[in-house]
A protein has these predicted regions:
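FIC/Doc superfamily catalytic core
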Residues: 1-373
């Protein structure tokens, strides 16, 4: 219980000395580790190109969902193109750059691709500036690349209409931020006592509790958590999205944060929720990766069949979810070949049992993948 008028966790005398029951968390932590290992083993068995596609899908989902948690909806095609451009993944035509999307992507990629580098105040300032390239959050000008100064009052997390707002949390005053962040960064970069996955949960909670910026704290906290998880796995490729799972459990996420931030430094409940959410993220990634895994299975089944580059390109388009119906004229247009060559390519795949005909025949004849048994 809190004593006196100490409402928030950072007001406690023992702040920021986190405590948790390792024994209570051991079973869940073991499930998380085993699920991580199984997923990584499975992904390492599908080939480099498909792993890159899986990584692209997950990073795209991570960027989209981390922003959605804060009520911001980004263009999926812009996010996917921005990530593909930076990682050098071939996805066909790229959508024109959007500097706001590029900034969010830059932060997420810096956290996961450069996870071995120390996290510093300057690096955090860079992430914050990338999130708000115009210097505004909506219509409000905010301090960019600098800690908040509380010029308009204490930093509060509120909900409800103006005049009847409910205060869910109030962060430490601005004059404490240099010390607060210095303590956090020292722990994050140096202290290796806690399990790496536990550290991810603590880092997320600690940063969002300090709430050092005018805006963007949640997204940066989740990027820091992803950075810690990437360190735990020692891999720059991501095959599950914790942010996507948090978005699915958004109400529970905010309820657990509020309860923890108004509690003591004993944070086993928070870590139990975090580990459970992480486990559900790993176990639920099948849906997101279904297309990539289906492609892997398809090419495994047809590995012994010689195909030309045009056939491989068009089959991959079908596997990725071709919009509309694939006709011989569309084949010729996409593959940049003559109608006769397109028809020979298609006939060859029909004879081998890779494709089947559909449609009414004649000019309306179209082709699709033969269902795999």
């Amino acid at each position: 219980m809190n004593s006196g008028n100490k409402v928030y966790i950072w007001e406690q005398d023992d702040w920021p000395h986190w405590r948790f029951d390792s024994v209570r968390l051991d079973g869940l932590l073991d499930q998380v580790r085993r699920s991580q290992e199984r997923l990584l083993d499975r992904m390492h068995g599908i080939g480099v190109g498909l792993r890159d596609q899986a990584n692209l899908r997950i990073l795209t989902e991570d960027v989209l969902k981390s922003s959605e948690i804060e009520g911001e909806h980004l263009n999926p095609d812009s996010v996917r193109s921005s990530i593909a451009r930076r990682l050098g993944v071939e996805i066909g035509a790229l959508v024109p750059a959007d500097r706001h999307v590029d900034g969010v992507v830059d932060m997420v990629l810096d956290a996961t691709q450069n996870y071995r580098k120390n996290l510093t105040a300057e690096r955090l300032f860079g992430w914050h500036a990338a999130l708000f390239p115009t210097g505004y959050s909506g219509l409000t000008r905010i301090r960019i690349g600098a800690w908040r100064d509380d010029a308009t009052g204490p930093m509060q997390v509120v909900s409800g209409p103006q005049g009847r707002q409910k205060v869910h949390y109030e962060a430490p005053p601005a004059n404490r931020l240099d010390i607060e962040i210095a303590d956090f960064l020292l722990w994050f970069n140096v202290d290796q006592q806690a399990d790496p996955v536990i550290r991810a949960g603590l880092a997320h909670l600690w940063f969002v509790t300090v709430h050092p910026f005018d805006d963007g704290n949640g997204r940066i906290a989740r990027a820091i958590g992803d950075m810690a998880l990437t360190r735990a796995e020692q891999s720059t490729q991501r095959f599950y999205s914790l942010s996507a799972q948090i978005q699915r459990e958004r109400k529970n996420y905010y309820d657990m944060l509020e309860r923890t931030q108004k509690g003591t430094l004993e944070v086993t409940d928070w870590l139990e929720w975090f580990l459970g959410c992480l486990l559900r993220a790993i176990q639920g990634t099948e849906e997101t990766l279904a297309v990539v895994l289906a492609k892997a299975e398809f090419w495994k089944n047809w590995a012994g069949i010689p195909m030309n580059e045009r056939q491989i390109k068009l089959l991959n388009r079908l596997l990725d979810g071709f919009e509309g119906k694939l006709t011989s004229s569309k084949w010729a247009s996409i593959a940049k070949c003559s109608p006769d060559t397109a028809l020979r390519d298609i006939t060859d795949l029909l004879d081998r049992g890779v494709l089947i005909r559909s449609g009414a025949g004649g000019r309306s004849t179209c082709y699709e993948l033969k269902p795999q048994v």
